[in-house]
């Protein structure tokens, strides 16, 4: 496929991480949803210090542009569904349970700076050849992965006559222990067999983006299990 065009965002998945950026295995550590408006990933860049060589007569003898420092992405998720499970995984705010043990709400508490989550997204790809693959398939998607997002925090919320949009902010970190991940997100062979990432991100990377023929998971309004990858070896 050449020059893919990105259409609308389809599906998002978040996964709970431990304080070292590793996926937490278990039944209540993932969440998949599609009821959101947008995800912004804004680069956080610190300008480098320029060096100017200036002679006594005022003439500039040389100039070296400072190298900017990329600190990561400032993440902003605008979403609609008030899911206690999603909010608990991304912010650390505890879930409020009903008489039957089902999640019915959440508490807003102190910022859990030691908590973290991974953020994955699938966006539709437009093109004449998105379904023209040897292994068949249902199309193609742009897949992006932020393997370590920290400092999840809910933003302002105003409830009135208009539709209510909630906002989650966070910041990425490099490194971590995502590895090749606990999920099958791309084709592992020419037959289109679903498999995990072929290689992990390097220690200085904050995001990975690629085209995949593996369809996103189905959205469900409840926790989803994290059982693949490192979980299989533990």
Predicted feature locations:
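Oligomerization/assembly interface segments of phage tail-like spikes and tubes
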Residues: 56-58, 62-87, 162-176
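Polar/acidic, low-complexity leader/linker segments enriched in S/T/G and N/D
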Residues: 1-47, 230-232
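Short helix-loop boundary/capping segments
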Residues: 106-159
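Aromatic- and glycine-enriched beta-alpha-beta binding-site module
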Residues: 65-125
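Acidic Ser/Thr/Pro-rich low-complexity disordered segments
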Residues: 23-28, 122-138, 182-202
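Beta-strand-rich interaction surfaces with strong enrichment in secreted/lumenal proteins
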Residues: 4, 64-65, 156-157
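Short N-terminal edge-element motif at the start of the domain
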Residues: 27-69, 85-103
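Mixed-charge, glycine-accented linear interaction segment located at domain edges/termini
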Residues: 145-234
